[in-house]
Design a protein with these regions (language model features):
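Conserved phosphate/anionic-ligand binding catalytic regions in large, soluble enzymes, centered on
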Residues: 153-170
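Structural signature of FAD isoalloxazine-binding scaffolds in flavoprotein oxidoreductases
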Residues: 173
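Long, Pro/Ser/Thr-rich low-complexity/intrinsically disordered regulatory tracts in eukaryotic proteins
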Residues: 1-151, 166
Length: 173
């Protein structure tokens, strides 16, 4: 299966890739920076159980792993492919990761937020990525209660993500 970063973009050569990221937190748990190890393990287990059938909902196959169980080489490879950042890669707190076979979808559990959904595509495809991110978000929202405030929106670890929890970006040549 071809990975997103192996595709050749001939339609808009200046746009290397697109990314859409959604962050969410669960209502009943403290933010990851305030969550003790035992509760973090419990939450990750609940999220992994809730996500185990995600592939049947979006047609992808996912690999699931705990970051602490990955070899250093695998962590570095996932970091280089921007599945997670260096803070999460080097962190000691319990964390989980799910990656689709084509590596277009990466989901980090208990990183800087409880859930970080990230989608990539070669070229300019923000609308398509947003649609796919929304489907995954809906899937999760049917199974878990998000930390949400009527005035502020989705509550996140960083003030810049409060509200929609959405960040969309493109890498240009």
């Amino acid at each position: 299966m071809m990975k997103w970063f192996e595709e050749v973009n001939r339609t808009r050569p200046a746009v290397i890739c697109s990314r859409v990221r959604l962050v969410r937190n669960l209502e009943q748990y403290a933010f990851p920076s305030r969550l003790d190890g035992k509760l973090a393990e419990e939450m990750i287990g609940r999220l992994e159980d809730g996500l185990k059938d995600l592939g049947s909902a979006d047609g992808r196959h996912y690999e699931q792993a705990r970051l602490q169980e990955l070899r250093d080489l695998d962590r570095r490879a996932l970091r280089e492919r921007r599945v997670f950042n260096s803070t999460i890669a080097s962190g000691k707190a319990p964390a989980g990761v799910m990656v689709s076979d084509d590596e277009r979808v990466g989901i980090v559990l208990n990183g800087t937020d409880h859930i970080r959904i990230q989608l990539f595509a070669s070229g300019l495809h923000l609308d398509e990525l947003w649609t796919q991110a929304g489907l995954i978000d809906d899937y999760l929202n049917e199974r878990f209660d998000y930390a949400f405030d009527d005035k502020y929106g989705y509550l996140t670890s960083f003030p810049t993500s409060v509200g929609t929890g959405l960040r969309a970006s493109v890498v240009l040549h």
